[in-house]
Design a protein with these regions (language model features):
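SAM-dependent transferase fold signal centered on methyltransferase-like domains
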Residues: 1-276
Length: 276
């Protein structure tokens, strides 16, 4: 994808400008989102057109013009090619997700992680997704595993509305339980009531870690997502174990989910609690 896009752009905007373009882009449904560096922003329409020419399934291209930020983890987007439309339908793992890329946070780059988590959930488990968004983790789990309940908390009203829609269109109304409230309040109501907790909000997960522990029913699993500096793998696990030691539990495994910057990684730690 990277080489192909740069090759398409070089004769249009020049080799130097093409080289500066971050050529990996996210595809969400029929929408593409790309980061266009400042030095190449004047060529943004050419970048958008090149993406659409390279991928005929894409109907709209947006440039990300701000980092992911704020309580709802949103990013400012500017339409640079195709339809001026931000609502789409994304298909993944046999599931359907309706969403507005300007109103909610959604990353297609987490698709493999969603599948991995679903593969770990056992039949009959009670799962608490503390930061559910449009319901992606919750719905993939509920589609894959029999007889589960997935309590799904979200504070962004737009994301919550799309979660309701996605639960309906994936026919999971009795399995995924949507809750419009802060995860801390939901954790208090679910106290000692679940077997597994998902914490896919790296920026703030540690603020809610004690609440996650308190929601476990005598033991279970927490999947904790964090942003960490890129260091040696043995130093990562040592630092994590040292940070989490006061809370109990055992870090059974960890993995790199994705790169989020030149020096930052998103990691997930699979933590087991034998008793609370």
């Amino acid at each position: 994808m990277v080489k192909r896009l740069k090759e398409l752009l070089s004769p249009i905007i020049g080799v130097d400008a093409a080289a500066s373009v971050i050529a990996s882009y996210d595809v969400i449904g029929d929408i593409a989102i790309i980061k266009v560096p400042e030095q190449a922003f004047e060529y943004r329409q050419a970048v958008g057109s090149a993406i659409m020419n390279d991928n005929k399934s894409i109907k709209s291209v947006w440039a990300q013009v701000s980092p992911v930020q704020g309580e709802y983890r949103l990013r400012e987007l500017a339409n640079i090619a195709g339809e001026d439309r931000s609502v789409t339908v994304h298909r993944e793992s046999g599931c359907i997700f309706s969403l507005d890329v300007r109103e909610v946070y959604f990353s297609p780059r987490l698709s493999h992680e969603r599948e991995r988590i679903a593969s770990l959930v056992g039949e009959g488990e009670r799962v608490f997704n503390m930061f559910a968004g449009v319901g992606a983790f919750s719905i993939v789990i509920a589609k894959r595993v029999n007889n589960v309940k997935v309590y799904s908390a979200e504070i962004n009203e737009a994301a919550y509305r799309y979660m309701l829609m996605n639960i309906e269109q994936n026919k999971l109304k009795s399995t995924v339980i949507p809750i419009l409230d802060d995860a801390r309040n939901v954790a208090a109501r679910l106290r000692h009531g679940v077997d597994r907790v998902l914490m896919p909000l790296p920026e703030r997960a540690m603020e809610y870690y004690e609440d996650a522990i308190a929601s476990l029913d005598g033991g279970g699993w927490i999947h904790l997502y964090l942003h960490v500096k890129r260091i040696r793998s043995e130093d990562i696990i040592y630092s994590a174990k040292d940070k989490l030691k006061p809370y109990g539990g055992s870090v059974e495994s960890y993995r790199i989910v994705r790169e989020v910057g030149p020096s930052t990684l998103q990691l997930v730690f699979d933590i087991k609690f034998n008793s609370i």
